[in-house]
Swiss-Prot record:
This is Probable cytosol aminopeptidase. Disulfide bonds: none annotated. One of its GO terms (molecular function) is manganese ion binding. Its cofactor is Mn(2+). Signal peptide: none annotated. Presumably involved in the processing and regular turnover of intracellular proteins. Catalyzes the removal of unsubstituted N-terminal amino acids from various peptides. Keywords: Aminopeptidase, Cytoplasm, Hydrolase, Manganese, Metal-binding, Protease. Belongs to the peptidase M17 family. InterPro entries: Leucine_aapep/pepB, Macro_dom-like, Peptidase_M17_C, Peptidase_M17_leu_NH2_pept. GO terms for cellular component: cytoplasm.
Length: 483
């Protein structure tokens, strides 16, 4: 898909179709179209095609970035069925030129996303170009250089998000830990500024990553610890992302019910998001040093599977009582967080589809933010709102911390109560964060929006690419504050 900024007024631009935006359901200004609207009972909601005049009338609820994304997604999905190549539209400017143009591109590319590699009949579209006039929707003037930055940023962010979706949507037969390692290596080959290191099970044993290794015991596919890194010449901060990469989770001996096992290919969403983030960071050439530590494994059943009642000694030296083998992601993250802290980060963020409790509490569309530093949590939350991803803060408290105490080890991998499960999982991870990094750490539970078995907003069925846009947006904010 191409996005072209054109200096001409909208009427002077040649294209196969035109987008006409309707704000606040205000149809009074459309005198010529009055009869056409009445004939089609159109009241300014949704979309209306005028095939004779080659126009698509499109609701734009506001100039908020999310509404821009939703409108452009609707535009693409409506027009992709037609035999056209180009569309023209006015510029849509909200509070920020860069963000507005980025949102426009994101809406189109999210609308165009499909995971159809296993379909025998694939639907293709001839639509290949969006031509954006410098004539602004409300007659305002804007900086063209900022518009170009926005178009580029939107394309990079959307492509990185869709890259993440492809990883999450891929089937478990194909997508093993070795495949994740291969994708990480290919990512480094495609971008000379990204370095990739892959570590095998012998390295994990040497590093005493026993919790990580235990999860992998019953799988025929060996685990991999993946380290991706990017470093700008004038890096302002060192940021480390840790991603849960369960390429499939059966629950282990604490076997999931059949219905719950469906969609567990998506348990690699945290690692996939981290890969999408570093891809975007490198393409945007952000002045940062960014590392991604990914724990890739399966959690399967077998005669050599780890068991409830086991006690594991983690890389941090913290002993863990296993009371449920389906609480495996936190075991992998515990050792990966330990490894990540050796990199001495200024900011440490882990991402995981960690708990069903998070989905029960927040719904399918919202990720949870947790940590010890309220200012950091609030900054991230406010930044995430601008990215288009939904988040909320879940606060730690000492009473929930009591629930993960163990009588035979330093900590239990599940709580003694089923209530507050998202927070007790976060508190478990906090047990492995060293004192000097307590205030530099954020835990993101992306279990809801990482994968949904329905389309919503501009997200298609399946993977949502959760985590990519909100984290990259926060990194951009960090750099803005550093100036």
């Amino acid at each position: 898909m191409k996005f072209e900024l054109n200096d001409k007024k909208l009427d002077a631009i040649k294209a196969d179709f035109e987008l006409v935006f309707i704000q606040d359901k205000n149809l009074k200004i459309f005198n010529k179209e009055k009869d056409f609207f009445k004939l089609n009972n159109y009241k300014g909601e949704g979309a209306l095609l005028d095939l004779n005049n080659k126009k698509l009338y499109l609701e734009l609820k506001s100039l908020a970035y999310e509404d821009i994304r939703l409108s452009l997604c609707t535009a693409y999905k409506t027009l992709e069925k037609l035999n056209i190549k180009s569309v023209k539209l006015p510029s849509i400017i909200g509070d920020c030129v860069v963000r507005s143009f980025a949102s426009l591109v994101e809406g189109v590319l999210f609308g165009a996303y499909k995971f159809d590699k296993y379909k025998s009949e694939k639907k293709t579209s001839t639509l290949e170009k969006f031509i954006i006039s410098n004539e602004e929707l409300n007659g305002k003037k804007f900086n063209k250089d900022e518009a170009k930055i926005g178009l580029e940023r939107g394309e990079i962010l959307a492509n990185a998000t869709n890259f993440t979706k492809n990883i999450v949507n891929e089937i478990p037969e194909i997508y093993t830990p070795l495949k994740m390692a291969e994708d990480a290596q290919n990512l480094a080959k495609e971008n000379k500024n990204i370095i990739c290191k892959i570590y095998d099970e012998k390295f994990l044993a040497k590093e005493k990553m026993n919790a990580f290794l235990a999860v992998n015991h019953a799988s025929v596919h060996p685990p991999r610890l993946i380290h991706l890194s990017y470093k700008a010449k004038n890096a302002k901060k060192r940021v480390v992302f840790v991603g849960k990469g369960l390429t499939y989770d059966s629950g282990g001996l604490s076997l999931k019910p059949a219905d719950f096992m469906l969609t567990m290919k998506a348990d690699k969403s945290g690692a996939a998001a981290a890969m999408g983030i570093i891809k975007a960071v490198a393409e945007l050439a952000l002045d940062l040093e960014v590392h991604c530590i990914l724990g890739a494994t399966e959690n399967m059943i077998g005669g050599n599977a780890y068991k409830p009642d086991d006690v594991l000694i983690s890389r941090e030296g913290v002993s863990i009582e296993v009371r449920n083998t389906d609480a495996e992601g936190r075991l992998v993250l515990a050792d990966c967080l330990s490894f990540a802290q050796d990199l001495k980060p200024d900011l440490l963020i882990d991402m995981a589809t960690l708990t069903g409790a998070c989905v029960v509490g927040l719904g399918e569309f919202t990720s949870a933010i947790m940590g010890n530093n309220e200012e950091l949590q609030n900054d991230f939350y406010l930044s995430s709102k601008k990215s288009g991803e939904y988040t909320t803060i879940l606060h730690f408290n000492p009473h929930l911390r009591e629930l993960i105490k163990s009588n035979i080890a330093d900590v239990s991998n599940t709580a003694s109560s089923r209530y507050g499960g998202a927070i007790t999982a976060g508190l478990f991870l906090d047990k492995f964060i060293r004192k000097e990094y307590k205030d530099k750490w954020l835990h993101l539970d992306i279990a809801g929006p990482a994968y949904t078995e329905k389309s919503w907003g501009y997200s298609s069925f399946g993977a949502g690419g959760a985590g990519v846009r909100m984290c990259v947006n926060y990194l951009i904010q960090i750099l803005r504050k550093a100036k």
